[in-house]
Amino acid sequence: PEFAQNGKADIEVRHLMSHTSGVSAWAQPVTTEDIYDWDKSTSMLAAQAPWWEPGTASGYHALNQGHLIGEVIRRIDGRMLGDFFAQEIAGPLGADFHIGLDEREFGRIANVIPPADLPIDLATLDMESIAIKTFTGPAPSAEIAWETPWRKACIGAANGHGNARSVAQVQAIVANGGRVGDTTLLSSETIDKIFDEQAYGTDLVLGLPVRFGMGYAMPSEGAPFLPEGKIAYWGGWGGSSIIVDTERSMTI
């Protein structure tokens, strides 16, 4: 209930799922260490005002989408996002994917390689722009992902650990209408809701044209590598990406 403060009373779950809530990161001051502390970081999000009118445009929730959705899950179900995912999704599917990693698994991790430096002078940028506030609220480096606190934390938007097979196993639920083998996790009606367009235009954080449904982006001119159809996709650091084609029952 406290999330409704400071102009957020009309934010719906679909806005969290589609990066349209107006709360695309933490307001300053914030550190990477702050987001490891679930209670502190979700309280910070609850207290701040949105940076644009919710529902009017997308702005990629690069680090905090898992905290926003995860706290909804925790308030309803009582479990943390990582535990809920492990017990309700990864476990039934036999998928080797983890949100918050046990230290015993650290030896299996391939470290993320830092990207090249940006070819721009950061001092010339508008530090009050939504994009800069998002990517600096906070601004973890790739090297931080090599460290124990990051690996063990519950950061649903950014620190899932798995491999190509496990990502495909989880997304196969969407590609196959909510059911894989004997495991049914989603109804056909829920699958259809993924493709309810929530925002289509220049993303306020990425600065690129993006078409968002619920939880995924969908084909648009910003993704010319995709065919048309009921396809959901996204990607991340290190070249990771997933394409979910519901018409061909395929995940790539």
Q: Model-found features: residue ranges?
A:
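Short, well-ordered beta-strand elements
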Residues: 242, 249-252
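Short, surface-exposed loop/helix-turn segments at secondary-structure junctions
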Residues: 224-232
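Short, surface-exposed loop or secondary-structure junction motifs
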Residues: 4-225
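Hydrophobic beta-strand positions
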Residues: 72, 243-244
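Short connector loops/turns at beta-strand edges and beta->alpha or beta->beta junctions
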Residues: 50, 247-248
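Short, loop-centered acidic/histidine patches that primarily coordinate divalent metals
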Residues: 219-221, 235-237, 245-247
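Glycine-rich phosphate/pyrophosphate-binding beta-alpha loops
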Residues: 154-161, 231-243
